[in-house]
From Swiss-Prot:
GO terms for biological process: cell division; cell wall organization; peptidoglycan biosynthetic process; regulation of cell shape. The gene is murC. It comes from Brachyspira hyodysenteriae (strain ATCC 49526 / WA1). The lineage of its organism: Bacteria, Pseudomonadati, Spirochaetota, Spirochaetia, Brachyspirales. Its main location: cytoplasm. It is found in: Cytoplasm. InterPro entries: Mur-like_cat_sf, Mur_ligase_C, Mur_ligase_C_dom_sf, Mur_ligase_cen, Mur_ligase_N, MurCDEF_pg_biosynth, UDP-N-AcMur_Ala_ligase_MurC. This is UDP-N-acetylmuramate--L-alanine ligase. The keyword Calcium does not apply.
Length: 462
């Protein structure tokens, strides 16, 4: 680790999915961890149960005199009074990304990047490595159900670390992985990058960050990633559905027996056999293939890779089944049009003869404005669509930008869409329109998960 002394480190916004994972690992290593957040949640309660002191509300007095460093995320304003207090005490203030980089610096790092699929791929690789006994330090952007956490540090002597590489604020360029994965590159986070070209340049820099003995796994089903590979100056392996790629899956071998997908994978034309994973969707076949490639590169036995995938229990908010009786209720984090389309396509292919009701809470005014026209085809696999107003995530409203204008765009391809501004008013509508056999799918990165969990409880209680 980066210091022999075990100082006290304070996290502002400790309940966030990325911040809480890093705090958990540092706590397991032996650092004294404190943190603050605005409200008590299941995650902050979990941190408290592990011995971490959590303050509720941001106050200057939360920065104790013996704090050595303060970690903050991009969601925290520079004018936050805890940051001001830390600086007045000459306490080092660093970003979440910088602390993550410190955790990786002296380890064999495996970093998973991409606009979509990071959390699932990170979780799959973690599961394979844990099953093989490598026991990596894990930093995951969702709750890994096998781990029952978004972090793992079960073996302090482990040389391996697996984490998501977050491109949203450029912090993934701080990391020093030996292996990296790029799942895809989409038009997202342009509020930070300014334009698509700058985003692509950042990903190319990430690809080229591996050392001479390292490598990248690049998904060639994504044309942007495939094009960037031409400028890569480090070793990489391609993966996808073509026999021309280093790792590939025979499309004809894919079969779905929901919730399990079976497929046959190859490495340089050598058949690796049939694999199964309890996930649906072509995108998850690709995520699984990336994890197979990483496992083989690490020297993990094929039997262990297969068993690791087979025993994967899933990750939070990635097509989680919350209820399955007269209707089936799923919840998913998808909020970008590409993610929504992929998720709905997966459900449609797995449950061909069932009616699908999609409930979507848009995320951020800026993202809605930027991606508005991309929503046109995103809901084509849904029979009924409900769209609420936008979850602001701290942003100020943009005049003319609302959930209603997304409805207008979606109606160009799907007439069965309705606008319900208040997400709290969705449940009575679902009660009115649902029929036995329906699939209800809630989508979004905001607080829609609270609504889906509430509806699941209501259904359970009759």
């Amino acid at each position: 680790m980066f210091t022999k002394r075990k100082e006290k480190i304070h996290f502002i916004g400790i309940g966030g999915i990325g911040m809480s994972a890093i705090a958990s690992v540092l706590n397991a290593i032996g650092f004294t961890i404190t943190g603050s957040d605005l409200a008590k949640t299941a995650k902050t309660e979990s941190l408290e149960s592990s011995g971490i002191k959590v303050y509720y509300g941001h106050k200057a007095q939360n920065i104790e005199d013996d704090v050595t460093a303060v970690v903050t995320s991009s969601a925290i304003s520079p004018t936050n009074e805890e940051i001001i207090e830390a600086k007045s005490k000459k306490i080092t203030v660093i970003s979440r990304g910088e602390m993550l980089a410190e955790l990786m610096r002296l380890r064999y790092g495996i970093a998973i990047s991409g606009s979509h699929g990071k959390t699932t791929t990170t979780s799959l690789i973690s599961q394979i490595m844990m099953h093989a006994g490598l026991n990596p330090v894990c930093i995951i952007g969702g709750n890994h159900f096998n781990l029952k956490s978004n972090a793992a540090c079960n073996d302090l002597s482990s040389e391996y670390m697996v984490c998501e590489a977050d491109e949203s604020d450029g912090s993934f360029l701080r990391l020093s992985p030996v292996i990296n994965v790029v799942t895809n590159i989409d038009n997202d986070h342009l509020d930070y990058y300014g334009n698509v070209e700058a985003l692509r340049v950042a990903f190319l820099e990430f690809i080229n960050k591996v050392p001479f003995y390292g490598c990248s796994f690049l998904c060639f089903e994504d044309n942007v990633v495939k094009d960037l590979s031409k400028s890569a100056n480090k070793k990489y392996y391609s993966y996808g559905f073509s026999k021309d790629y280093d790792f590939y899956v025979d499309r004809d071998s894919i079969r779905v027996e929901a919730p399990i997908t079976y497929f046959t994978a190859y490495h340089n034309s050598e058949c690796l056999g049939e694999f199964s994973v309890p996930l649906i969707g072509i995108h998850n076949v690709l995520n699984s293939l990336a994890s197979i490639g990483v496992g083989i590169h690490l020297g993990i036995d094929i039997a262990d890779i297969k068993e690791g995938l087979k025993t994967f229990e899933g990750v939070g908010r990635r097509l989680n089944k919350l209820y399955d009786k007269e209707i089936t209720l799923f919840d998913d984090y998808a909020h970008h049009p590409t993610e929504i389309k992929a998720t709905l396509s997966s459900v449609r292919n797995a449950y061909k003869n069932r009616r699908i009701i999609a409930v979507f809470q848009p995320h951020r005014y800026s993202r809605t404005e930027l991606l508005l026209n991309d929503f046109e085809y995103a809901f084509n696999d849904a029979d009924e669509v409900i769209i609420s107003d936008i979850y602001a995530a701290g942003e100020s409203p943009i005049p003319g930008i609302s959930g209603e204008i997304i409805c207008d765009v979606v109606r160009k391809q799907n007439n069965h869409v309705r606008y319900i501004p208040n997400i709290e008013d969705v449940l009575p509508v679902l009660d009115d329109i649902k029929k036995d056999g329906d699939i209800i799918l809630t989508l979004g990165a905001g607080n829609i998960v609270r609504i889906s969990n509430e509806y699941a409880r209501k259904l359970q209680n009759g």
